[in-house]
Amino acid sequence: MDTKRRQLLRFAAAGVGMGFAASPLEALACRPTTPAKPNHLLIDVHCHIFNADDLAVRGFANHIFMHTSGRGVLNIGNWLSQMVDWLGQLSAPGIRTETRLLESILTGQVDPYDAYCRVEHPHGGILAQASNYRLHNALAMMALYPETDLFVPAMVDMDAHLGDQALVTPRQQVDLMEYIFVITGGRFHGYAAFDPLRQVRYDEKRPNGRDSPLSPLRIVKRAVMEQGFVGIKLYPPMGFRPIGNAALDGCKGINPRAPKYDAVLRELFDWCAAERVPVITHCNDSNHANVHDSENSECQHVGSPRQWAQLYESHPEYRGHLKVDLGHFGRADMHSRNRLKLLDAERENWPNAPDLARQHAEDMKEAAGFIAAMAAHPESLFADLSNYDTLDTDRLRKAFSKDMREMIAAHPHLARQLMYGTDWFMTPQGAVPYLDNMRDALPPDRHGPFYGANAARFLGLRRGEATRRRLEAFYRKWGIADPDWFQRVDSTPAG
């Protein structure tokens, strides 16, 4: 969007007083009554509000779920992926449509909550979210989780590795999300997505174009410095590591440009460390794009906790300055589920008991990898417990609580590094149990750090810290008041 148009919107937003942004929850009359705030800060450090237009759906379905290139006339998997892609794009509002809606809200022509409440939204998880306006997804999150002070949604950029192209570019995502940050009164501030392959391809086409507003690095830097974003999102399972990408040469599905990634990522990390910009990375061994099909051990679990630890060992200047959230902390909920299955199998002498034992051993190795890396770099590496939606029985919830409490007792440093997140978990029936499950899994004296204090330290939200200063400037630019959660952050013990 051009600068003059953006300035006009800022003046208009300030002129109408942004009243809806000052008290957003009270305006959601169509939702259940807002309960009292908990006695601790609550930050959802890992969530999503994007829709189908932001994701290369066909490529994602091909590579992640079906592990096919999508090539070939008779490729049935590709046909199915294209159908899913078509349905998602058909139902999701286009970028221009939503941009016009957001601009009409910013200029006071439309009340966002009236528009939201007059539409029937299924809130049925991923599929419903994929077809909604992004603003509606944000308002739904606020209604489902009214206790949450700050939501930190992550954008996505997987096009280059998936051999497909989303309908919305990363730059368009950034511009649209800025409006949502303003309209929600600072309840949302996100991570801008970055893909090193996109930058490498851009540099090949425009070797002298780093200063262009179209440069991927320039887009994410501007997003953080000027547009209300608080960090950077990386998705290594697409086919890259934080360091040592030359070792991926020859792995199945890896782009031949992989050896060039290190220089691009080094530039990004240097900037993040200097400006105190946090990074969130998908670190769970899941959602990989074919690379794991290779037999070479170097191809396994790209972006693992160990590889992030190696980054700090190779670049000690990053320690304490470049903070990274290792997303999905080893899926400890699945480990609890598999442990119970193994106990049942051994008690009943089931024939699959040996297979379950091997699976449980592999699961515990993944959790151990997170713990070891976080122990080695306690001021740099964090992790979130997000998308833990498998805790669907009382027995499993108790097992998860037992496992987590024992884990934290054995590794006390985790209490200062684990953070709360929801990821995709958006169903109304699951919202309250999800929060309760997380609370039950941790000792009461660690609730404050887990739900807010650790995230505030990771993001740099306290008064005088870099992210806080950038957000204060962002609110001044748009002429809106500082959010209430500023005071809650400053009054929360560091943990």
Over which residues does each language-model region extend?
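Active-site gating/metal-coordination segments in enzymes
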Residues: 147-303
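Well-ordered, non-membrane alpha-helical segments in soluble/globular domains
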Residues: 109-140, 165-180, 206-221, 254-268, ...
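Catalytic metal-binding/acid-base residues of hydrolase active sites
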Residues: 48-50, 235-237, 284-286, 330, ...
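Acidic (Asp/Glu)-rich catalytic clusters
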Residues: 139-146, 174-187, 218-228, 274, ...
